[in-house]
Amino acid sequence: MDMYAVVGNPVSHSKSPKIHGMFAQQTGESLEYTAIQAPLDGFRETVESFFIGGGKGLNVTVPFKEQAWNIVSERSHRAELAGAVNTLLQRDGRLFGDNTDGEGLVRDICVNQGVALSGKKILLVGAGGAVKGVMAPLLDEGPASIVVANRTVSKAEDLARIFGRNGVVCARAFADLEGPFDVIINGTSASLAGDIPPLPDAVIASHTFTYDMMYSLRDTAFVAWAKARGAAHCCDGLGMLVEQAAAAFYLWRGVRPDTAPVLAGLRQGD
């Protein structure tokens, strides 16, 4: 039976084994998918051991996505732009890295939530690896503009410089934001700790679609903040998790699973 796994630290909380198990059952693919906690200083060795032992593919989660980018022999174009890798497989004995996070986000927003991004004013909150990983796929949708807001403005300016050739991208401090925006995407993990960045109320209106890339059993702090300010359409990142997993599954197996029943099952299970 073909072996796959997710590698992270910590990783015991990961929903990936359940998601890929549901994909395998649905598609009739014969595989086993587990979770592997790699030592913080032993990621490369963990990956090498997995593939030497006959493993077929790995998902990579926090905090190893940047390390994964560095150890591969080849990268997809989107992984190259993202500076991070979340999916590994071997091709002709060489380690290949891809990044399906941005595809997962865009598919969840555009397909599952039915929100078109073309021509929209988008606010991206945060300027870390999660935001960098989704910038190119968001720009591919043809928004009117993307504003990146971050506590450390220089980090947002770095992203604006890197991706500005692909569309209209600007950097702002939170205090300098003017709105409202059509779409606000939170790419920080702060809301899981009950915290949100100091966003002015002017950025949001009733028509604003708000999306938290994080997810939890209850509303994240960001989703609660958006609802309290009258946003009619708010969403967490569980759909992104399922969609990026489906993209990885397709890369490995050549079969694209139906994500709707898997997402519904996870929502009910939660």
Swiss-Prot record:
Binding, shikimate: S14, K15, S16, T61, N86, D101, Y215
Pfam families named in the record: SDH_C, Shikimate_DH, Shikimate_dh_N
Binding site for NADP(+): G126, A127, G128, G129, A130, N150, R151, T152, V153, S154, K155, M213, G237
TM ranges: none
Cellular component annotations (GO), alphabetically ordered: cytosol
Organism domain of life: Bacteria
Annotated active site: K65
Catalysed reaction equations from the record: shikimate + NADP(+) = 3-dehydroshikimate + NADPH + H(+)
Record's keyword annotation contains Amino-acid biosynthesis: yes
Assembly: Homodimer.
Similarity section: Belongs to the shikimate dehydrogenase family.
UniProt name for this protein: Shikimate dehydrogenase (NADP(+))
Source organism (scientific name): Hahella chejuensis (strain KCTC 2396)
Gene: aroE
